Amino acid sequence: MGIRTVAVYSDVDFRSLHVEASDEAVHIGPPAAADSYLCKEKLIEAALSRGCQAIHPGYGFLSENHEFARMVVQAGLVFIGPSAEAIAQLGDKIAAKALAISVGAPVVPGHHQSLSGVEEAVATAEKIGYPLLLKPASGGGGRGMRIVYSQSEIEDAFTSSQTETTKAFADNRMFMERYIPRPRHIEIQIMADKHGNVVHFPERECSIQRRYQKIVEESPSLAINEPIRRTMGELACRLARKAGYTGAGTVEFITDENKNFYFLEMNTRLQVEHPVSEMVTSLDLVEWQLRIAAGEPLPLMQSEINAHGWAMEARICAEDPRRGFLPTVGMITRYATPRGKGVRVDSGVRAGSVVTIYYDSLLAKVITHGENREEARERLVQSLNGFHLEGLITNVDFVNAVVNHRHFVAGDISTNFVEENFPNGQPVDEPALEKHHYMAIAAILIYHVRKGLVVESLKPMAAKIGRRPPAPTATEYVLKGEGCLFNVRLEGDQASRTWKIAVDDTSYYVETPEFEFYRRRLKLKINGRYQMFRSRYQEQHIQIFFCGLI
């Protein structure tokens, strides 16, 4: 679009990709976000010092901060987003519920007014019935939310929820509504210009979450039919018009197991998962944001926005699923992203990047597109298999396991999916014996070939002309896995790359590629079908992760 950009950076981000990609960059302060990226005055000062005309708030906290939006406009700059008034109204969940009701949107039954204290909370809970959900009027990300199953829990839940909310958002207002078991999370992307035009895009499903934060998204959704899809889109546009909204926004709904849907909230910004919508429409939503902010009308009307195919996105985060998804830190020592038809990677890091304690754990997004859901899913699996990151623990293998899970493949998902199928970050379903055998084969081959290379390197050099190659011999191993032992008998050699391997009493015929140990990825052809594995060397152990059929 020919727009020059100015980036801001903190002390620890002076070598970041966003700094390198911008035309200019301004140092904004120390690592702590409150003293740099969230400091409103410093951001505005940086913009004015470089002669900027507008500020794009990204999709962080300031993108939904009405005070910041107001300060930007007062400084004579354009805020690329809705007005401060719209942000204030829709950012208040109680006010947003009232607005949604006024345009005819269904809401979850409950008490959509601020609770005065514990006594009112107890009395109101009796009227609504259990289980119920306590929610803060401000904020997001699941902070302050509590599921309450009985009267004995309500007092402690209200007190702890209000305390957390006050600390996080400086707002102690709480409300409550009926808890919807196993809901699905559906959202509608809207765009509104300054001329009264509003359009909606195909829905996105964001039901795969951990700690109320999304990790896998897709569009369209299997959860809704065409009439519901159309109604959701119309209600989202109606809500935006009522609020005098401009720019990009997302209206969120939940559906219950009977396919009833309810308004949840509206996010007054562009979502992290917006590439999913871009992949199914071939439209650039950030470009739309910029054109709207410049006063242009919407590039397309509703009838001109068409969806094709299916898209999925997986968020790659620096976190440890086995430790409650705690953030991890460190330097990225190896980094390679997948490529291919229908594959897009939005990344903020590279080899040498240092992941610190100061910012969000999101490192990259892998987005795939296919003619149908299964093709998009298969491309996502292949892309995750080809996503290579070392130096710190990430959730790559976890999200790969999620999209390979039989319930995900079948579309049987809800916001409880991770909790039900991956408690403590590990699958409930025990892998089939065949998969255990596959992992045993991968581990033994890695060990056997590495050992053979070492032995060969220690032999004296000798002419091989006129000598017959030695006949392949069988080698037997006992492999110790997690809580089990495998007797493995291996015949073959790396020269032919073909092996006959018996795991306990089951035989497999295996073809191997040229081993490239530095890649940590291994593709084996087992009984005629390709399987993908990832390896990790830890002290005297080889860890094998099964990444699925390819």
Model-derived features: where do they sit?
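Structured core elements
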Residues: 6, 27, 56, 133, ...
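Structured, non-catalytic alpha/beta "coupling" segments that mediate domain-domain communication
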Residues: 54, 64-71, 323, 526-550
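A conserved acidic, glycine/proline-rich C-terminal tail/linker
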Residues: 505-531
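Short, low-complexity Ser/Thr-rich regulatory SLiMs
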Residues: 178-180, 190-194, 253-257, 336, ...
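N-terminal beta-alpha lobe that positions the nucleotide/phosphoryl donor
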Residues: 1-251, 255-274
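Short acidic-glycine loop/turn motifs at beta-strand connectors
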Residues: 150, 192-197, 256-259, 294, ...
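Catalytic cores of soluble metabolic enzymes centered on carboxylation/carboxyl-transfer
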Residues: 236, 275-506, 513
